[in-house]
Each structure stands twice: as structure tokens, then as C-alpha cells.
Amino acid sequence: MNEYSLTPVQEVDGLHIKRDDLYAPFGPGEVNGGKLRQCVMLVNSVKKDYKSLLTYCSIHSPQAPITAAVARANGMPCRIVYGGTTRESVAALPMPRLAMKYGASIVLAARSGRHSILQARAKELAAQENSFIVQYGINIIGYGDTLLTAVAAQTENLPDDIENLVMTCGSGITATGVMIGLHRYGKRVKRMHLVATAPDRRGFIHETLKKYGADREFEYHDLFHSPGFVYEKSAAATWGGIRLHPHYEAKTMQWFRGSGIAPESTLFWITGAEPRSPGQS
């Protein structure tokens, strides 16, 4: 399977599931899914102009190992910029450990892990070594066509008529790409449910959809601001034996199970699965 292959839609215990987690070019248990595909296509489009890759993110984000794996596949050095953490935490946590397994070096660049502070440090570091910066959610500014087209193409094999489409919304890039694809391939989705595990991206989503002539209504379910929600806290959920990502789809599945929406009328979009960390069986 390459980055242009369609991942399957499976019917599991009455629920249609888009299995984008099955895009796993580096093998079972490794980094996978739609965000990996976006990173692969992004780096393919820029690698001739840069010597190395660099990303900055939360120590819990799969963006670090995804970037590291793509860098290794292209023979490029990779640096991961973290803030507000320690060497001990980096050595113990699964995402930094996996990034290091793929050959990335870790830079503890700031006392704070705030996005704006890490972004400024990343720009300084990138300028020193002609590094391309892979940004939060995978770069949308300047590379929108590449990324959104990669996502939109995956809607081609969805059923033509869907009553409810349920998916996680973080940066909003995948959700936006899906809705562009629904428009492009004439898929009729009655209710689009975005379950948010990050700050509100509705403005960005509508603005981007308008540029592609694909703006539409969607229902926005805000988990991020709900009482007790913590991004870093894992959730556990499975469906028909499919183990869902503890930071993303597992939380969306917990919401779905309590929503009253019938599985038989729903397509559930899985963007990716949690990769195994080093030492994990």
C-alpha cells in the first residue's frame, strides 16, 4: 500500500468504519494513518530544498515519531523540539522514545511547552541547518492542496449515502479534507459530526471549505472544553476488536456510545492507531 492507495471501509458489528489506520507503510505496529500519509506527501514535495526535518509538539503527540519515521525513510536527519519537560520524561514516554527509535535527536528548547514559544525556537533552529519544519497538524499554510487532496482522495470509497459521519477533530485538517472529498465525490452525508479534542477550529474549517467550494454544515461536539477533559489523559475504547487510539478516536468512541446515534446509520472515521512504543509487545 502506498500513499495513493485507498484504505478500506469495513462493516464491523453494524458500524461502517473507515480504516485509515491501515495505511502502515513501515509495517504493523509502526506509525500509521492519515497524518503519516500527509507527512509523507508533504516531505516528498519539499525534500529537494531542505537538508533535514524538524518538528515541535507535545511530548504526547504522534507527530514526533511520524516526522522521524518519514525523515529516516528519506535519509534525512530529524530533530524533535520539546519544551516544559525533562530528559527523564523524554526517556520514559512512548512518543519521544519511538521518535528516537526512528533516529531523531531530541532538543529541549524551552522551559515552557507553549506552542508559540516552541514555534519561535523551532524557527531559530531550522534556520541554522536548513531544516524544513513540520508543524502542528501537519502544515496547512502553503501546502494546503497537497495535504487536503491527500485526505479528500480517501473519501472515494465511502458509501454514497451516509446518515451520520463521526470523526475526531484536532487541528481540523483531516476533517476539512474529508468534507472537501465528500463534495468532490458527490457523497451525501446527512449529518457530519466533529468531536473536538483540541481548541475550536470551526472558523478555520469553514474558511478553508469555502476556498474549495465545499462549505457545509456540521455538528461540532466540544470535548476539549468539557469538565474534566485532559488531552494528555488516555482513554480506552474498542469496537469489534479494533483498539482505538487512546488520545483521539477512543475519546470520540466514548462520546459516540453515549450519543444515542445508531451504529447502523453511521460511518466512523479512524485517522490512525497508536503505534507500539519500544519494548511494547
Listing of model-derived features with the role each one plays in the protein:
Residues 27-39, 134-156:
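A glycine-rich, Thr/Ser-enriched phosphate-binding loop motif common to dinucleotide/cofactor-binding enzymes
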Residues 257-281:
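Phosphate-binding loop/pocket of nucleotide- and phosphate-handling active sites
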